[in-house]
Structures are given as C-alpha cells and as structure tokens.
C-alpha cells in the first residue's frame, strides 16, 4: 500500500479568525462520526489543513467515497509516502502518474523540502523527478502555470510524501458549528433541499413532519423517513418528530372558510413546530418555501403565517425557481424519493381557489371561533420520534418487510 494519509483542506474555516480552532474541532468530530464503522481514526489537525492516517486500501476507498459529503471540506488529496532517497521518489512518482494515462495532461512537479538536511535542494529534486517522469508517459507535457496535474512532493523528516489528485469537497461549514434548527420536512422536493443547504451552513437539524391518517398513508410517512435518513449522509444524526395532525386539519376544514384554510393550516403547523423547537432547544425553523411558487408562498401569505411566532423562519430556497431546486435535489440524491406519488397533509383538503393575498385580521377572526391550542398541545405531546441514520440491522428488517 503506497497511501499514507489523506490531506484535507478547509473550506470557509480559513476565514474564521480566533474561532477557527472551534470549527476545526467540530469538523474532526463530524469526520469521526461519519466514519465510525472504520474504528478510531488517527486525525492530526493543523491550522490550515488536517491529516487522516491510512491503515489499508479498503479504509482509503471508504474515506475517498465519503469525504465529499462532509461539509467544511474544500478539497482533499490522497497522499503517498516513500523512503527519502531519489530512486524511491522517482518510482513513487511513476506509480502515482500511472493513474493519469487515460488522456493528454499537462503537469508540473512542485517540491517542498521541510527537512533541510536532505542533500538536494527543492529545485534539484524537482528537476530530477520531472526529468524522470516525463519520458515515461507520451500523454504528458510540461506546463508551469495552471497545469492539469501538479505532482506535489514534500520531503519531511520521517519520509517523502507525494500527491497529485485534488478531490473537491462539499465546502461550507461543519454541521453543528452554527447551532440547531428544526426543519419542516413535508416529503416533497423542496424541504430536503432546504435542509441540505442549512446543513451546508453549519446548522444541525432535527426535522418535523405532519401526518394525517387515514387521509395520508403509511407510505407517505415511510417516504419522509427515507428522506430524513438521506440527509444524515451529510454529516450528522437527525431526529424526526412525527406529529399526529388529523384532528387539527379536520377542525380547520369544518370551521375555517376554504379559501383561507391553507393559510390557517400553515399557521397551525408553525405553532406546533414552534413548541417542538422550544422543547428541543433549536434556535430557528427551516422551511422549503420559495416565493410565489404556490398560493401559500406569496408575501402576503408568508406574512400571515409568520404572525404566529417571533422565532426566526429560515427559507434558503426563497429566491430559487423550481428547476434550480429540482437540479439540486437530483445532485444530493433526494429527488427520486420526493417524487413518489404519496399524498402528504399539504395536499389533502386543498381548496379549489385559495387566497393568494389573505388578510391577517380576517384569518385570525375565523380561527378565533375554535380552540386550536388544546389540539396543538395534544399533537405535540403525542408525537413519535425516530432517529436516523438507521442501524444496518434495522435497514435489513425494512427490506425483508418489503418482500412480505
């Protein structure tokens, strides 16, 4: 095995000043959590980069596959090592460059000599390795500025280290470095994408889903569980709070005029979410709303909905159009699950002509004739909580159940 370690370059952490080490510690914890199945990882941190020691090829492959999903990483590189003699360096350089034989590339060799006792200076090492590698590959040509491949060589005190591949990371900030919020997870396309974007900004998420049996099926709930589980691959556990919402929706249908019933439904959801948020110690509520996309997402509707709380409502998709949201959903792997045709509570009892510019005072007047507070308290108390990611044995049980 030639691979010795993985070098990780930080994303926005490089701009964080005195708080930088807190962000780095959070990133290290998230990496350990994401790869807990690999056992204890040996991670060394520096102010501008992080190193993960590699023990075998299987571990290396798992890390290379999973690290691009961890927020806070700008890029990373597999690093190989060899003895500190020119012959070993040349042979390692050939081995690394063998992986770039598929098409024409420009390249250069960049050398850093940390061990000043090594007899050759950096420029001499550069000429030796470059002059040895170039004749071995017909597809390579030298380019000093912005080459396709930069073979980086570092002569340290213990060994010589080399890297040539720079793999893009997810960028952003480590999940958990910017507090916790509650995501309203509907099961549609938008809300998982909103959750992803907030995680990218370092926000740890719990999720809330409104379930209205028998009007919504068990399949719709299972779909949301899959989406919650999908979001955990970006670096953290997620607790999903499932709210029994049938009583509240039936009362809205019976007592509130149909043209503002959707506004009231969203207001009651927000009231429930705010109580759960307070219980779990979250600082904000996250939604997948996009301005003007549907009747409940006009400025007038959002104003009427927001009026039930002083809690910050974060809407990362507010200026995105539907095609942009779909494209991102496809990229993060939630789209195919989101489009499964199972109704959620937002699609049942949908009025034929909902108000796009509801008046807050009228909505409050219609709601004043019903005691929603008691139903809200009961829904919060009777919620079910699921923790994701699922353990492997639980996933196997689900697959077996699908066969029955």
From Swiss-Prot:
Mostly located where? cytoplasm
Molecular function (Gene Ontology), one example: ATP binding
User: What is its pathway?
Assistant: Cofactor biosynthesis; thiamine diphosphate biosynthesis
Output the Pfam families linked to this UniProt entry.
ThiI, ThiI_fer, THUMP
Q: Which GO terms describe its cellular component?
A: cytosol
Q: Which SUPFAM superfamilies match?
A: Adenine nucleotide alpha hydrolases-like, THUMP domain-like
Q: Which reaction does it catalyse?
A: [ThiI sulfur-carrier protein]-S-sulfanyl-L-cysteine + a uridine in tRNA + 2 reduced [2Fe-2S]-[ferredoxin] + ATP + H(+) = [ThiI sulfur-carrier protein]-L-cysteine + a 4-thiouridine in tRNA + 2 oxidized [2Fe-2S]-[ferredoxin] + AMP + diphosphate; [ThiS sulfur-carrier protein]-C-terminal Gly-Gly-AMP + S-sulfanyl-L-cysteinyl-[cysteine desulfurase] + AH2 = [ThiS sulfur-carrier protein]-C-terminal-Gly-aminoethanethioate + L-cysteinyl-[cysteine desulfurase] + A + AMP + 2 H(+)
The places in or outside the cell where this protein is found are:
Cytoplasm
Which EC numbers characterise this protein's activity in its record? 2.8.1.4
Cystine pairs annotated here are none
Task: Briefly state the protein's biological role.
Answer: Catalyzes the ATP-dependent transfer of a sulfur to tRNA to produce 4-thiouridine in position 8 of tRNAs, which functions as a near-UV photosensor. Also catalyzes the transfer of sulfur to the sulfur carrier protein ThiS, forming ThiS-thiocarboxylate. This is a step in the synthesis of thiazole, in the thiamine biosynthesis pathway. The sulfur is donated as persulfide by IscS.
Name of the protein in question = Probable tRNA sulfurtransferase
Native organism is Lysinibacillus sphaericus (strain C3-41)
Query: Source organism lineage?
Result: Bacteria, Bacillati, Bacillota, Bacilli, Bacillales
Gene that codes for this? thiI
């Amino acid at each position: 095995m030639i691979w010795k370690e993985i070098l990780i370059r930080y994303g926005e952490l490089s701009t964080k000043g005195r708080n930088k080490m807190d962000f780095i510690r959070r990133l290290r914890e998230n990496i350990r959590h994401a790869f807990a199945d690999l056992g204890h990882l040996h991670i060394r941190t520096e102010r501008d980069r992080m190193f993960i020691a590699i023990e075998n090829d299987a571990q290396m492959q798992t890390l290379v596959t999973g690290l691009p999903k961890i927020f806070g990483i700008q890029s990373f590189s597999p690093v190989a090592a060899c003895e500190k003699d020119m012959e070993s360096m040349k042979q390692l350089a050939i081995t690394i460059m063998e992986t770039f034989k598929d098409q024409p590339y420009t390249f250069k060799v960049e050398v850093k000599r940390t061990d000043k006792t090594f007899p050759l200076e950096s420029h001499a090492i550069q000429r030796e390795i470059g002059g040895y590698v170039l004749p071995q590959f017909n597809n390579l040509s030298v380019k000093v500025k912005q080459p396709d491949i930069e073979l980086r060589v570092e002569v340290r005190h213990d060994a010589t280290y080399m890297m040539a591949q720079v793999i893009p990371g997810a960028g952003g900030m480590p999940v958990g470095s910017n507090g916790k919020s509650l995501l309203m997870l509907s099961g549609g396309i938008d809300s998982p994408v909103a959750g992803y974007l907030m995680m990218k900004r370092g926000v740890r998420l719990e999720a809330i889903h409104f379930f209205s049996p028998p009007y919504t099926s068990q399949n719709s709930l299972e779909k949301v569980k899959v989406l919650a589980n999908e979001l955990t691959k970006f670096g953290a556990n997620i607790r999903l709070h499932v709210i029994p919402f049938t009583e509240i929706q039936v009362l809205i249908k019976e007592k509130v005029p149909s043209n503002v019933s959707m506004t009231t439904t969203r207001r009651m959801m927000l009231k429930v979410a705010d109580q759960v948020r307070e219980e779990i110690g979250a600082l904000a509520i996250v939604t997948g709303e996009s301005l003007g996309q549907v009747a409940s997402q006009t400025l007038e509707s959002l104003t009427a909905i927001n009026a039930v709380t002083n809690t910050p409502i974060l809407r990362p998709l507010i200026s995105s159009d539907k095609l942009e949201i779909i494209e991102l959903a496809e990229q993060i792997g939630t789209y195919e699950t989101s489009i499964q045709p199972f109704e959620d509570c937002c699609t049942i009892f949908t009025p034929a002509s909902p108000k796009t510019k509801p008046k807050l005072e009228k909505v409050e007047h219609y709601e004043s004739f019903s005691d929603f507070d008691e139903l809200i308290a009961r829904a919060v108390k009777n919620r079910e909580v699921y923790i994701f990611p699922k353990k492997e044995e639980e996933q196997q049980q689900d697959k077996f159940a699908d066969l029955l």
